[in-house]
Amino acid sequence: MRKDIHPEYQEVLFHDTNADVFFLTRSTAKTKATREYEGKEYPYYPLDISSASHPFYTGEQRKTSNEGRVASFNKRFGAFGGRSKAKKTDAE
């Protein structure tokens, strides 16, 4: 087997920002952010949604505070309209 081809498998602190719940588990997720949890420093990975806030697992519907990328883009640039058709002149 070749050496040094596998990603580092380490303990990572995941944070569901909507439910404000922390999960400590092992993962290969890469992140530069760190956070202290129960007296130890762990790599920190924020999540928009997890089993703690997903309607399928919680059994309740609630709106998440974060918008998706497409909705955010449309909110910022939706007023521009998009493609416009070229106007025909009477000279044709």
Curated annotation (Swiss-Prot):
Keyword annotations: Ribonucleoprotein, Ribosomal protein
Any one GO biological process: translation
Signal peptide stretch: none
PROSITE patterns from the UniProt entry: RIBOSOMAL_L31
Cellular component aspect of the GO annotation: ribonucleoprotein complex; ribosome
GO molecular function: structural constituent of ribosome
The family this protein is said to belong to: Belongs to the bacterial ribosomal protein bL31 family. Type B subfamily.
HAMAP family referenced in this protein's UniProt entry, alphabetically: Ribosomal_bL31_2 (MF_00502)
Assembly with partners or alone: Part of the 50S ribosomal subunit.
Protein name as annotated: Large ribosomal subunit protein bL31B
Source organism of the structure: Psychrobacter sp. (strain PRwf-1)
